[in-house]
Amino acid sequence: MDSGDDESPAPDSHGTFPGNFDPASATEENPASQMPEGMGPSENTANRSGLKNTNGMPKGGMGSEDVKLQYIDDDPDSYSNIFDNAKTDISAADRQRLIRSLKQLSQGENIEDVVDVDEVIRYFVVHNFVCNGDSYTGQIIHNYYLYEEDGRLSMIPWDYNLAFGTFQGSDSTKTVNTPIDTPISSGSADDRPMLNWIFKSEEYTQLYHQYFAEFIEGVDFAEIIDATAEMIAPYVKKDPTAFYSYQEFESGIDTLRAFCLLREESVEGQINGTISATTSGQAEDSSALIDASSITLSDMGSMGGSVGGGFKPNSDQFRGPGAAPTGNTKP
């Protein structure tokens, strides 16, 4: 979650609603040059849902129906957390088009007409690998961008500084084994229609598992982490404004590497059936769960930071080691 102090996001780049309709973590100024490639201004709509108060904390809407991307009714006023935070100028036709898409999404009919199926499944594969409770699948639901084009929706990543279980603060073994088929950490998948359609369909669930298998087989987590650490280490060491010591940075890197390798092992087991991929299944039989008791999640950061203790709204303590400074930096 950001700690920016602007009260409402300015219109900005290309085509999304509640996530770029950013549902409830209002973004700071977000010029098109800082959006992902291909996300420049267009006739489509972008936004994030939710405003912030002067302390940088959300005013509301973090778990409202529109932030969850539920269909409410046909009145645009019922979707204020979306439309009040659009990142581009939007028309009445834009509003009605999005509402129609949300209605069809909630009904679960002809999903491919209103969702970019491939993009959204791939989004949730990576999202569910990193165990981010500060997100659409967690307690702070508003942390995403939603991209809309011609009535079809997709998700854009946002706010992952408390991923890898550091938001939840739960035990490491539980987090490493987060079930990929029931990833909601707070609430039910039934009220998260942008995710629920995957698991309501055997075809889409199989595709989700296929993409998950391809992801863990195709990514060398240790190599990426080590290469990135080597690249930024000299700057971390010399940073005069650092709020973590260099030793804490190194410890965070070691823990992140270990977490990803253990998470990879758990996901592989969940895909091949040696570990249950659901919360209920893991509760019934935990014998095959991957033991992650050797790592400490807070080494990668926490809600309160590691220096001075305690949560401080609108401060850098609301971030983990190596997180980007508060400002306009985007994923």
Where do the model's predicted regions map?
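Phosphate/dinucleotide-binding and metal-coordinating scaffold of catalytic cores
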Residues: 1-331
